[in-house]
């Protein structure tokens, strides 16, 4: 909507609607006024296995069109389960992007296993690169983008503007 008028946006990602999956979050880059970058988390059926899992995409938004789309992260493997995709996006004051992925209905294994994607909060540079000081960058077989693990289904996340701490809200 702009000035009370509805507009269509072209170039949106293919979003899989399955159970609790769909479009999860949209966040503008902190410098959106200069770079027009927008970020999405959504359920995607692309990748390994049947079903879907959570993806983080960046795109440029101009004149009601998304262009230069790039999937920055895609949880794998896909799951046919329809619950706990997460997800929220937040930027810290240093420009790092954080996003969450729910445990996808496997609460006893996924959150505690750093070789698996689900049940985590991730940290990336805004272009998708993995920061060299992430906690598990040098851990064999670990998902290098993990910032914290042991989460069930983080569907709320903010950065404390005074301390820089991540506040996340878990369901369940």
Mark where each language-model region is:
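Short pre-catalytic segments that frame enzyme active sites
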Residues: 104, 127-142
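Beta-propeller blade signature
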Residues: 54-65, 112-127
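Solvent-exposed, polar/charged alpha-helical surfaces in well-ordered, non-transmembrane soluble domains
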Residues: 70, 87, 119-122, 152
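Conserved loop/turn at the beginning of each blade in beta-propeller domains
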Residues: 19-20, 81-82, 140, 147-151
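Acidic, Gly/Ser/Thr-rich repeat motifs that build Ca2+-stabilized beta-propeller blades
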Residues: 1-108, 156-159, 164-171
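Active-site rim elements
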Residues: 106-110, 141-148, 155
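A structural motif
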Residues: 91-98, 122-132
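Sequence-structural signature of mature extracellular/luminal beta-sheet repeat domains
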Residues: 36, 117-118, 125, 129-132, ...
């Amino acid at each position: 909507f702009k000035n009370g008028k509805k507009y269509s946006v072209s170039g949106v990602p293919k979003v899989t609607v399955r159970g609790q999956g769909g479009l999860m979050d949209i966040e503008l880059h902190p410098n959106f006024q200069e770079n027009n970058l927008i970020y999405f988390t959504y359920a995607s059926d692309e990748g390994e296995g049947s079903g879907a899992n959570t993806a983080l995409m960046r795109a440029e938004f101009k004149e009601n069109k998304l262009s230069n789309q790039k999937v920055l992260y895609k949880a794998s493997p896909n799951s046919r389960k329809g619950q706990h995709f997460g997800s929220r996006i937040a930027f810290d004051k240093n420009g790092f992007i954080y996003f969450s992925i729910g445990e996808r209905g496997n609460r006893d294994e996924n959150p505690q296993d750093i070789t698996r994607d689900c049940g985590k909060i991730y940290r990336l540079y805004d272009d998708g690169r993995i920061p060299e000081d992430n906690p598990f960058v040098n851990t064999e077989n670990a998902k290098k983008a993990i910032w914290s693990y042991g989460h069930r289904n983080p569907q709320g996340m903010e950065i404390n503007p005074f301390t820089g701490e991540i506040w996340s809200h878990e369901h369940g």
